[in-house]
Design a protein with these regions (language model features):
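Catalytic and substrate-binding regions of extracellular carbohydrate-active enzymes
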Residues: 1-88, 92-93, 101, 110
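Generic recognition of flexible, low-complexity loop/linker segments
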Residues: 7-12, 36-42, 52-54, 134, ...
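Long, repeat-rich segments with strong aromatic
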Residues: 18, 41, 158-168
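Hydrophobic residues positioned within well-ordered beta-strands of beta-sheet architectures
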Residues: 21, 51, 66, 145, ...
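Broad, structure-driven detector of short, well-ordered beta-strand segments within folded domains
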Residues: 39-42, 104-106, 112-130, 209-214, ...
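Trp/Gly-enriched beta-strand surface patches
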Residues: 86-148, 298-313
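A surface-exposed beta-strand-loop module
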Residues: 140-157, 321
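Non-catalytic terminal regions with compositionally biased, polar/charged low complexity
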Residues: 167-338
Length: 338
């Protein structure tokens, strides 16, 4: 059984509807220990935003791929084509490399859509391929529909981004792909995607999903913090927020963690926090505190004895301290004081 030396892997649940999953990868010593990556998945209703950073290895013989889908086509599924940028593809065998200078929209045989932004080398295929049966005792062959992002051989700090739309249609997929061509109509925005954090804004649910891969200190200037509050929570609650990397309300975390904050009615917010690191000591998960800092002054509308909400006397920020244990999510409702 393969075991990883990485402990930052797990998820967050938000209002029992949305969530986040993160996986920090380090290849096993018996396979390729040079392989590393950070993968995150942000789940909003039927939309999944998938991000990857820090993809690196020293394998100069094989290309590194991020699989979008790999569907075995039985007798009933074989006649079904995949849809590539609005055009059905039924041919067998078929393999196409898509233009990296364009965004692309794919639909697999099960009605799952994929939107891949520009700057990525995407391949799609429908062909016979060999594979091992589940007990790895013999080799089989079958017809598969596949799509993948090619990062090349021995990638160094490669990245990816794509959106998955569950149970969609060609018409709906085309409309959302067109909407993504403008930041004014995009259904999601990636505010940060680097070695420090993956942060995504979902327009429909008005939610911000955050994966902090490293600790983030409080900004040194009060003016920057005040500006974040005014732009994210405008004076009128009905106004839309100005969403940008400089306005995200979660401004500091003391260690890597997950957080999702959703705009509620009025000037309220629903905040979920989780630490996927189980903090295992002698084989048991041990509780430990985690402090997350928000711009502005907040009070808790859902008091919890294991949660402390404290407004800073020296800066317009609120420190929220929760007890994390066994990877569970801590959720609370906050109200903006001013």
């Amino acid at each position: 059984m393969l075991r990883s030396d990485q402990t930052f892997v797990g998820g967050l649940s938000h209002r029992k509807r949305n969530g986040i999953f993160v996986m920090r990868i380090h290849g096993a010593k018996h396979h390729n220990p040079s392989f590393r990556a950070e993968k995150t998945y942000f789940l909003f209703d039927n939309r999944i935003i998938c991000l990857g950073t820090g993809i690196v290895n020293d394998d100069t013989e094989h290309a590194t791929h991020t699989n979008l889908f790999q569907k075995h086509l039985g007798e009933q599924e074989a006649p079904q084509g995949i849809v590539v940028d609005g055009q059905a593809a039924h041919q067998v065998p078929m393999k196409r490399t898509l233009d990296p200078e364009r965004a692309h929209a794919l639909l697999d045989t099960q009605g799952t859509g994929y939107i891949i932004p520009t700057g990525q080398l995407v391949n799609v295929a429908r062909k016979n391929q060999k594979f091992r049966e589940q007990h790895d005792k013999k080799e089989l062959e079958g017809l598969f529909a596949t799509a993948w992002i090619d990062h090349g051989k021995a990638p160094s700090a490669a990245t990816y981004e794509y959106a998955v739309l569950v149970n969609t249609s060609p018409t709906r997929l085309a409309a959302l792909a067109e909407a993504m061509e403008s930041s004014d109509t995009a259904f999601y925005q990636v505010l940060q995607r680097d070695s420090v954090a993956h942060i995504v804004w979902d327009e429909d649910s008005r939610s911000l999903g955050c994966v902090f891969l490293e600790p983030v200190p409080i900004p040194p200037r009060k003016t920057e913090i005040t500006g974040r509050v005014r732009r994210w929570w405008p004076p009128k609650a009905t106004d839309s927020p100005l969403v940008s990397p400089l306005t995200q309300p979660i401004i500091a975390v003391e260690r890597p963690c997950l957080a999702m904050i959703q705009q509620g009615p009025g000037h309220s917010a629903i905040l979920s926090i989780a630490d996927p690191d189980l903090n295992m000591i002698d084989g048991l998960s041990q509780p430990r505190e985690l402090t997350v800092t928000l711009a502005g002054e907040w009070t808790s509308a859902s008091p919890n004895p294991s949660t402390r909400v404290r407004v800073d006397d020296n800066a317009p920020v609120t420190h929220i301290t929760v007890v994390c244990h066994q990877g569970r999510t801590v959720e609370m409702t906050l109200r903006k004081a001013r």
